[in-house]
């Protein structure tokens, strides 16, 4: 598992969570990924921090099976009107 694949997994998880939470498509406006440890196999967990009618703010963590935090991410998404 490389740092690039961890970043890609975090971004994919953030985009999927934003679309699911909004009930439709969203555009990724910005994302910040921070690597905190050496790359390892794990999974992304996403949390919605704030949601308005037109914008969503999410955060994510990439954790190993043992619970070690490998990376974090924060993103802003524009909700696209149906």
Task: Identify the function of each model-found stretch.
Residues 1-82:
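Terminal targeting signals and extreme-terminal segments of soluble enzymes
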């Amino acid at each position: 598992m490389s740092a690039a694949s961890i970043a890609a997994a975090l971004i994919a998880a953030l985009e999927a969570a934003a679309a699911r939470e909004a009930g439709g498509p969203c555009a990724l406006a910005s994302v910040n990924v921070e690597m905190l440890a050496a790359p390892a196999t794990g999974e992304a967990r996403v949390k919605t921090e704030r949601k308005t009618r037109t914008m969503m703010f999410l955060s994510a963590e990439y954790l190993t099976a043992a619970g070690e935090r490998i990376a974090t991410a924060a993103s802003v998404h524009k909700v696209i009107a149906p």
